[in-house]
Regions:
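Well-ordered, non-membrane alpha-helical segments in soluble/globular domains
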Residues: 20-21, 64-72, 93-100, 233-250, ...
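Active-site and donor-binding regions of nucleotide-sugar-utilizing enzymes
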Residues: 6-31, 36-200, 302-303
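Short, flexible/disordered intra-domain loops and linkers
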Residues: 46-52, 124, 222-239, 324-327
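Conserved catalytic-core segment of nucleotide-activated headgroup transferases in glycan assembly
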Residues: 197-270
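Catalytic binding pocket for nucleotide-activated donors in carbohydrate/polymer assembly enzymes
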Residues: 301-375
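Short, hydrophobic beta-strand segments that form beta-sheet elements in well-ordered domains
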Residues: 35-37, 112-113, 167-171, 258-264, ...
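Donor nucleotide-activated moiety binding/catalytic core segment of transferases
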Residues: 66-74, 193-196, 260-309, 313
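C-terminal alpha-helical cap of glycosyltransferases
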Residues: 370-412
């Protein structure tokens, strides 16, 4: 009997976190052949990926594709796939990923996109911004417009040698959007968000509540967005950390909550703890939020855990960051949909912290259905749902019982 072969295309270097996040261990433990191709350099040539050279997953083939020659060789592998898990894009076509997407199209094999991680659409408030400011922002953005990207997005797929995705994995109600590779041809597979999936694994209800506040760190001064967003000149990291630490000190003194740092997975705090010695925890944001009384973040999508576990949320920012034209509409959208006003770090000494210990239950409920999960609780994991969907379409055998074993992961 031929063993089903799943070929994954990942737009960033795989990490231990991705083993569960992308279902690698799940499908391996179902007895399938799983091949993972890291195409980060192909899809993001301006960003140097951070890779652990010792990283491996028992029973899973891992390979880096960084040159056009290696990309050409990938075409032959794609033709052997039962299913291509094309997770190098959520559906957008760009000049950088066009060669890869052509290989997928020419393989003739069915391919799947992952769109389970929807978030609020940018909220523009043009009517409240003075005309001179709007004009200045538009001129600034035009300096960084890429005509080739605009053309790539608008060309018919066939003209570009591409074809629509066969399937798309969805999360909440608003995760489906017809654009780019997602057309009327694309069949939905109803799942839920990765964060909801993580909550299912550890327990979906709050437990062992502690007097803690959790800062969902984004490694903000060194975030990779600044490598891409050339319109943003950066900001003073020392000033940022001084301000957040003043906020944390007030929270600890006035609210009686110990602030714990849920570190960004790519953060490097080995040489220095910029949070004045506060506890830094890697890889456990869900567990920390589940047990806390307040979650704090700038705009980390890990704020989803606050919604899942029904925890009050504090959104923070500062003038240089909040005013970035490309980012500001997203910040406004989070604030609007969650009913949480941003706390500006410039005002950290005077803001009423107690106001952030409340949350709007109705808005949380809507956010949960729109962006996280829109199905009745049945205990099935995201990848069990995906497997069921693919088997119903005749692409994979029906699922076996049992849970994936993620112990066979090696990294330095």
């Amino acid at each position: 009997v031929k063993v089903p072969h799943l070929v994954y295309l990942l737009g960033s270097a795989p990490t231990a976190r991705d083993v569960g996040r992308f279902g690698l261990a799940y499908f391996r433990d179902q007895g399938f052949r799983v091949s993972v191709f890291d195409v980060a350099e192909i899809c993001h040539p301006r960003i140097k990926p951070s890779r652990d050279p010792n990283f491996s997953i028992s029973g899973v083939e891992l390979k880096v594709v960084s040159t056009l020659e290696e990309l050409a060789e990938l075409g032959g592998v794609l033709r052997t796939a039962s299913v291509i898990m094309c997770f190098a894009t959520e559906g957008l076509v760009k000049p950088e990923n066009t060669k890869l997407l052509r290989l997928v199209a020419h393989s003739g094999r069915p391919y799947v996109l992952l769109r389970s991680e929807a978030h609020p659409a940018p909220l523009h408030e043009q009517g409240k911004i003075p005309l001179p400011t709007r004009l200045a922002q538009t001129i600034k953005r035009l300096r960084y417009v890429k005509p080739t990207h605009s053309v790539a997005r608008r060309l018919p797929l066939k003209f570009n040698g591409l074809r629509p995705a066969d399937y798309v994995i969805l999360g909440g109600r608003r995760s489906l959007a017809t654009s780019g590779l997602i057309t009327g041809h694309t069949q939905p597979i109803y799942g839920h968000s990765q964060d909801y999936d993580q909550a299912l694994k550890i327990g979906i209800t709050p437990d062992q509540i502690t007097n803690s506040a959790v800062f969902l760190d984004q490694y903000l001064p060194h975030h990779r967005d600044w490598q891409v967003l050339k319109s943003f000149p950066g900001f003073d990291a020392d000033l940022y950390y001084r301000r957040v630490n003043r906020l944390f000190a007030r929270i600890e003194k006035e609210l009686g909550l110990k602030v714990i740092i849920a570190a960004h997975p790519r953060a490097d705090y080995e040489k220095q703890n910029p949070f004045e010695g506060r506890e830094i925890v890697f890889g456990r944001p869900a567990e920390l939020v589940r047990a806390c009384k307040l979650a704090i973040t700038v705009s980390s999508l890990a704020l989803n855990f606050a919604v899942i576990y029904d925890k009050p949320l504090m959104l923070i920012s500062f003038a240089e960051h909040f005013s970035i034209p490309e980012m500001n509409p997203l910040f406004r959208a989070f604030s609007h949909e969650l009913g949480v006003p941003y706390l500006f770090l410039e005002n950290v000494e005077t803001v009423d912290l107690s106001a952030y210990l409340k949350r709007d239950a109705s808005l949380y409920q809507d956010y949960r259905a729109n962006y996280l999960v829109d199905h009745q609780a049945d205990g099935l994991s995201l990848w069990q749902r995906v497997h069921l969907g693919l088997s119903e379409h005749g692409l994979l055998p029906a699922p076996q019982s049992g849970q994936p074993n993620q112990d066979n992961i090696k990294h330095g």
